[in-house]
């Protein structure tokens, strides 16, 4: 198992790096050049930089990921592609994407886009909380223990 993180706006990178490093599982953070950092990562953690274009990180993750790898993303499109490839896919708020829930998530995203396109407003996501982080930590630890 390898872990790939759609890292541009991921609020749980610290949890992923800490837990994966303890378990000696390699982590690849995929992020745009606009988030470049000189920060040194622990052994087993690699950062890949991609162009800032739409979905560049998603495409790179899909090139790298193999069946049974673990991907952390908040992007439903990437989650759908990764599930089709046989990957385990987690959202940073602590839930697992599945073949049973991805269609509803994509449909909701589409309907919200149509509402916005018509000039109306939609609610954004709720703020990320400490409870969300702990929920993610518990799920992540259970997934890497498999």
Curated annotation (Swiss-Prot):
Pfam families noted in UniProt: DUF188
Superkingdom assignment: Bacteria
Q: What InterPro entries has UniProt attached to this entry?
A: UPF0178
In terms of NCBIfam families, this protein maps to: PRK00124.1
Query: Which family is it part of?
Result: Belongs to the UPF0178 family.
Task: Return the protein name.
Answer: UPF0178 protein BCE_3095
Organism, by scientific name, is Bacillus cereus (strain ATCC 10987 / NRS 248)
């Amino acid at each position: 198992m390898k872990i790939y993180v759609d890292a541009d706006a991921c609020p749980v990178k610290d949890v992923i790096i800490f837990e994966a490093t303890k378990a000696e599982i390699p982590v690849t953070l995929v992020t745009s050049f606009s988030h470049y950092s000189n920060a040194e990562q622990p052994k087993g953690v690699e950062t890949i930089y991609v162009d800032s274009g739409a979905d560049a990180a998603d495409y790179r993750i899909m090139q790298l990921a193999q069946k049974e790898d673990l991907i952390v993303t908040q992007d439903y499109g990437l989650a759908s592609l990764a599930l089709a490839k046989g990957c385990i896919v987690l959202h940073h708020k602590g839930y697992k994407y599945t073949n049973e829930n991805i269609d509803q998530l994509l449909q909701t995203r589409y309907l919200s886009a149509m509402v916005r396109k018509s000039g109306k407003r939609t609610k954004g996501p709720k703020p990320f909380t400490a409870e969300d982080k702990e929920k993610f930590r518990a799920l992540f630890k259970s997934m890497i223990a498999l």
